[in-house]
Amino acid sequence: MIIKVIPVGPIAVNCSVVADEKSGEAIIIDPGAEAEKILEAVKDFKVVGIVATHGHIDHVGQVGKLKELFDVPFYMNPLDKFLINDEIWSGFASYIGAVPCPEPDVEISEGDVIRVGDVEFKVLHTPGHTPGLCCLYEEKRRVLIAGDLLFKGSVGRWDLPGGNLVELKKSVKRVLTELPQDTLVICGHYDETTIGQERAFNPFAGELLNG
């Protein structure tokens, strides 16, 4: 498995390109901005799908352009369809260069599997930041693409459209307790981390794990 993490746009969304070395197939996850940078990252692969961890515009801002270029299915949880063309803040779509986002071709939910050659991502429905946020977990290689659920030393916001603090706490606790401590966590913004590091040092973890 090859993973390229490309920070895109003015708020540095982590777009991930995940490829299978044998087949040369790849998926694009959270293409929020700067389609040109993403195209450069996938130039040696055959793109077979586009996935959004959730529907906030900074994570889906280039889905429309890339779907048109590659003619591949777009995967997202349907609970976030109401968000995909919501600016959040006035002028934000223009600020990040977002284009209109289509509705998902494939509606993903808990327990689904997204395959890219030999790579298998299990879908974990982890609401709270948004109703439909889904993490993608590659069990064999212990990699979690967490979207905006969990960050290094922090957690996702719950005060944006679709946010729910009660659900967020449940979802963060779930990944911190169910996944192996050496799981690599690729966050929706900022640096990568591990489940073990967040269990030990994330200031939100103590309350969640001991409460």
Curated annotation (Swiss-Prot):
Which residues does Zn(2+) 2 bind?
D58, H59, D148, H189
InterPro entries linked to this entry? MBL_Glyoxalase_II, Metallo-B-lactamas, RibonucZ/Hydroxyglut_hydro
CDD domains linked to this entry: metallo-hydrolase-like_MBL-fold (cd06262)
Q: Which Pfam families match?
A: Lactamase_B (PF00753)
What keywords appear on the UniProt entry?
Answer: Hydrolase, Metal-binding, Zinc
EC number(s) per entry: 3.-.-.-
Task: Identify which top EC class this enzyme belongs to.
Answer: hydrolase
Picking any one GO molecular function of the record gives: metal ion binding
> What is the cofactor note?
Binds 2 Zn(2+) ions per subunit.
User: What family name appears in the similarity comment?
Assistant: Belongs to the metallo-beta-lactamase superfamily. Glyoxalase II family.
Q: What is this protein called?
A: Uncharacterized protein aq_2135
Species this chain originates from: Aquifex aeolicus (strain VF5)
